[in-house]
Amino acid sequence: MSLAPIALFVFARPQHTRRTIEALMRCPEFADSELYVFADGARSPSDVPAVSEVREIVGELLGDRARLKCATYNLGLARSIIQGVGDLCEKYGKVIVVEDDLVVAPRFLEFLNGALERYGDDDRVMQISAHMYPIEELEPQNRALFLPFTTSWGWATW
């Protein structure tokens, strides 16, 4: 299976970013995945210290392991994601998307990479979501299902 690149979007939350990266590192597929970190710019001068600290944490934990793309001004989350996901889909044909406040399970990358491969030719699927709202009737089934909406807490697309 060809692994999708990971797009990690970070801003000004140093401890969240640290926990997110540490959780990703516990996924076995992480070591063989391409990683792009999109670091948004400060909204105001008061954001600069936290934005700088986030970038330092990325360097400390990942070193040259990640391709760090630092915005010089604040793009905002939506624009940053649209640009980053678009660029990576154009280059690789698929992408796994993580924001800086997610703590993923060790099988997160396995699930999303497998689903990208399994559903890649299925026109009904536009996105694979790693998060599922707690619906009591579905919990015992613990399986993937088709839903008419998306979630943004860890996802993948083509």
List where the protein language model places each region.
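An acidic/histidine-cluster motif and surrounding catalytic segment
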Residues: 1-97, 102-157
